[in-house]
Amino acid sequence: MASIGRLAITWLGHSTFLLGTPGGRRLIFDPWLVDNPRCPEEWKRKVPTVDLVLVSHGHSDHVGDAARVARENNAPVVGMVELCRWLQRQGVRRVEPMNLGGTITVAGLRVTLVEAQHSSACLDDESPIYLGAPSGFILTLEDGRVI
């Protein structure tokens, strides 16, 4: 991960990315590490240090390790309302529940939830649980860049 002042993106397989911002923040998108066949082994064994967790939807290959990463970092999770409430039941203390089109400032960054076309449910004891609409993220970084 890059030092302060630079933007760095590290792909950890499938849809899991670590983002290091110019201001020194560390974010993880759709943290699926342990069961992710494309995730490097060293990342499966350790929980990355992050300031913010962003989860796009409720499929296990996107939300799989979100609760563990958030709990171990005491990091807030940004996602749809239903998904955040479900993560609270998994022991996540800090959530930023949102709806599509909403914008918040969290960890010094502006986050906007945008529409995505996909399904969004997880299997909990083999019964599907709807976890809100799928979403994407628009981030405004500390230096004003938008990604």
Positions of the model-derived regions?
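Portal/gating segments that form or line small-molecule/metal binding sites
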Residues: 68, 72-73, 77, 81-85, ...
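Short connector loops at helix/strand junctions that flank enzyme active sites
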Residues: 47-49, 106, 132-134
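Pre-active-site segment of Zn-dependent metallo-hydrolases
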Residues: 18-59, 64-71, 82, 120-129
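Short hydrophobic/aromatic beta-strand or adjacent loop that forms the aromatic wall/cage
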Residues: 14-16, 101, 132-136
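Short solvent-exposed loop/turn micro-motifs enriched in small/polar/acidic residues
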Residues: 2, 10-12, 88, 95-97, ...
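Zn-dependent metallo-beta-lactamase
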Residues: 1-26, 33-38, 105-117, 125-126
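Active-site-proximal loop/helix segment associated with metal-binding centers of metalloenzymes
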Residues: 113-146
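Conserved SAM-binding loop
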Residues: 11, 55, 76-79
